[in-house]
Amino acid sequence: MTGRGGAKKSRAAGPAPPTTTLVLDNGADTIKAGFVSDDKSDGKPRIIPNCLARDRHRKIYVGSELEKCKDFSELAFRRPVEKGFIVNWEAQKEIWDREFFDDKAAQKCDPSDTRLILTEQPNSLPSLQTHCDQIVFEEYGFASYYRGLGPVFNAYRDIQSIFRTPQSTIDSPAQVILLIDSGYSHTTVTPILQGRPLHPAIRRLDVGGKLMTNYLTRLLSVRHFDMRNEPYIVNEMKEAVCYTSLDFKGDLEKTWKGTRGEKREDYLSGAGIAKDYVLPDSHTRFHGVVRDYEPGVSARARKGIVSTEDVLTLRNERFVVPELLFNPSDIGIRQPGIADLVKQSLLAVPIGLWPGLLANIVVVGGNSLSEGFCQRLQTEILKRFPDECRVRVARPEDPIISTWLGAANFAKHEHASKLEVTKQEYEEHGAAWVARKFAAGLGLDP
C-alpha cells in the first residue's frame, strides 16, 4: 500500500510480546503457580489448595484462604477439577480471580501482558479443552497461551540427575522416559520420546489420592469412629501413617488378630506396624499426631475409661490403602495395577524403545511420596519383564512440584514460542485451529 508521494505505508505493528509467563499446574488437589521470565524465575511455585471449603460454622474459604482455617472438623469441599479435568469453571474462576487477579492477590498479574502455560491431563475431552481455551482468551484476555500435557513437561527437567547422570542442558527434552504420575484423581503412565508423548501407549488407572482417602474413611468408620464427614482429617492421617508394603502377605499376617477368643502375640504387641493416631480436638490441637503404639491405650478404651484424647490404632489400614495402586481389584475395580499398566503401555510401543523406557522410569505426584513406593514399583515391574531388562525407578526430590518445574524450563525453550497461541491468532483463526495446533504437543523439530 502506498501513501501520498508514492511512499510505502508500513503495516501496523502487532502487540508487543508478553514480558512474563505465568505457569499453572492446575491439579485437582492443589494449584502449583509461579512466574517465569527471561532473566528470572520464582524458583519454586506457590502451592494453592484448588478448592472452595466450608467449615461447620458455614464460613467459606477460597483457595489459599484455607490456610487461615483452624477447625478442620466437618470441612466440606467443592472442587472445580474432577477425574483430572476442569468441569466447574464457576468455581475455578473464583479461585483464579482471588489468587491472580484480585488487588490483594499474592501473585497478581496483568493478563494482557502475560503468557499463560497451563497443564492438562492426557485424553481430555475436546469440548473441555475448547471451553478452557475460550475462558483463557475471552474471559481473561491473556496475551498468549499454551496448554500442554502435564506429564510431558517433566521431560524438560534434568531427569537424569535423579539417576546420578545429569545431562548437559536441562532445558532440552529428555530423550526417552516413562513418566508415571500418581495424583489426587488418578494415575497415568506416559511414554515420552524426545518431548513427544506416545499417545497410543498412554494408560490410566482410576486410583488416586481421593479414592484412597475415601477407602481409609470407610475402613475407619467400620472399625473405629464414624469419619465420613471428616475428609480433611482422614487425608492428613493417610499421608502421615500409610506406607507401601514390600511384603504385603507378611504384613497382613503380622496384623491378623487371630481366632475368636485368642489374640496373637504379634497383634497384641503391634508387630512394629501398629501406630496410634491422636485426632485433633479443634481447641488445643488442630492437626493429628502420630505416636508409637501403646497397648495400654486400647485396653483403657475397651474398659470405657474416659480419656482426654481420641486415639485411633491403625494396623493393616496403614498398608492396605496404598496397596490399591498395585491391586485395585481388592475393592472391585476392574483395572490392572500400576506394574501391569506399565507392561500394557510398553506393549503398545516398538520393542526397540523398551530398554530406554525401562531404564528411565520417573514417578511424580503426591502418592509417590508413600514410603516404599518406588522400591515396590521396581520390584513389581522386574517380575513382568525378562531378566536381561534393566529397570530403574526414580522420584524427583519434590514430586509434587516436578511438573511445574519442567513447565518453567519449557517456558524458556524455543518450543514454547513456536507452540504458543497469541490472542490475535485466536481471534483470527478460532478455537478449532487452536485445538489442532495444541494437539501437535511438545518437542516438534524447529
UniProtKB/Swiss-Prot annotation:
The record's Gene Ontology cellular component field reads: cytoplasm; cytoskeleton; Swr1 complex
Lineage, top-rank taxon, reads: Eukaryota
Question: Which Pfam families does its entry note?
Answer: Actin
Q: Which CDD domains match?
A: ASKHA_NBD_Arp6
UniProt keywords, alphabetically: Activator, Chromatin regulator, Cytoplasm, Cytoskeleton, Nucleus, Transcription, Transcription regulation
Cell location: Cytoplasm; Cytoplasm, Cytoskeleton; Nucleus
MF terms per GO, please? nucleosome binding
Keyword Amino-acid biosynthesis on entry: no
Q: Which residue ranges traverse the bilayer?
A: none
Q: Which InterPro entries match?
A: Actin, ATPase_NBD
Gene3D superfamilies, alphabetically? 3.30.420.40, Actin, Chain A, domain 4
Basic residues: bias regions: 1-11
Please verify whether the record's keywords include Transcription: yes
Region listing for Disordered, in residue ranges: 1-24
GO biological process, any:
chromatin remodeling
Question: How does this protein assemble?
Answer: Component of the SWR1 chromatin remodeling complex.
Family in the record: Belongs to the actin family. ARP6 subfamily.
- Cross-referenced PANTHER family, in alphabetical order? ACTIN
Q: What does this protein do?
A: Component of the SWR1 complex which mediates the ATP-dependent exchange of histone H2A for the H2A variant H2A.Z leading to transcriptional regulation of selected genes by chromatin remodeling. Involved in chromosome stability.
Q: What is this protein called?
A: Actin-related protein 6
Write the gene name: arp-6
